[in-house]
Amino acid sequence: MMGFFLAVLAAFLFISPSWSAAASDQDNPIEIGHVSWSRDYQGALQASRHSGKPVFLFFQEVPGCLGCRTFGSQVLTHPLLVEAVEDEFIPVLVYNNRRTGMDAQLLNQYGEPSWNYQVIRFVDANERDLIPRRDRVWDIGSLAARMVAALKAADRSVPLYLSSLAVEYDTSHLQTAVFGMYCFWTGEYELGSIAGVVATEAGFYRGREVTLVTYHNDQLALKVLIGEAEDRQCARTVYLNDHSTAVQSRLKIKQFEPNEYQPAPASDQKKQLQQWLMDHRNLSLTMMQLTKLNSFLAGDPEAMLQWLSPRQLAQLGSR
């Protein structure tokens, strides 16, 4: 069941083809993504001391192997990740395949191997690691989670768009439940606002309207999710996989068969948000942002805007 839903989620994790890159540099070598990098290490330390922002110290091989190119093209091009690197940190690029100058000096100082896969260190103005070094951090979710940890270690506030990105891409903790109801528009609206819900999708199961809910099981227990659906009186039945059907609930608990589920047409998805999306069609949104905006637009527009990043908000204001 999880493989089926993660495939569906992956198809929607980032919506809309257009993004205003602001300070991002999209003419970079492929290995270093779209971040606007500094090569002035000492200047970065001074900027960190002045601002309190951590230094995002990126050791990378340029030109690099397939793994380095994949990291640059698939991770360091995500607009929200790029925004967080540029706005919440002082980004510095170190080439790990140069034998002289600042690059060689920093490789030696930090004990980093040359000609290696990418490594990111988060350091303060005194050149101390804010969190322990970790290798093999090669995906969006893992990097976003470490950025969150580094900001916390530096006693910096963590923007919601970044912490949400870490949750949304933490696929090892994403679970699903399917709620049968009289109206899947209501299901997306009601269930999408629950803390820990990552995504919703309107669909049909055995010909009946359902809402597919993807949630982060470290932030939201299944029994709490089902309890919320009960309290909001928006579901009659919950369809679960083999390992979850023992949950106690006033709702009917039934076994889920993935091959009998199909998504509703696009015209039925995120119904509360459709006109708003038409008015802001150039705005790029993750699936979690779409889910939250759909739930908060009608009843709490201020809460809705909290899910957007500063650059996204600036795009709204520039219409």
Regions found by a protein language model. Give the residues of each.
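Short active-site neighborhood of thiol/selenol oxidoreductases, capturing the structured segment around
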Residues: 51-65, 91, 173-180
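Thiol-based oxidoreductase modules, predominantly thioredoxin-like and allied folds used
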Residues: 35-39, 60-61, 81-103, 201-207
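Flexible coil/turn and secondary-structure edge motifs
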Residues: 144-319
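Non-catalytic, surface beta->alpha helical segment in thiol-disulfide oxidoreductase systems
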Residues: 74, 114-156
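Bacterial N-terminal signal peptides
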Residues: 4-17
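N-terminal leader/targeting and pre-domain segments
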Residues: 23-51, 149-156, 160-168
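Structural micro-motif
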Residues: 54, 106-122, 209, 235-236
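Typically the conserved alpha-helix immediately C-terminal to a functionally engaged Cys/Sec
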Residues: 67-84, 186-198
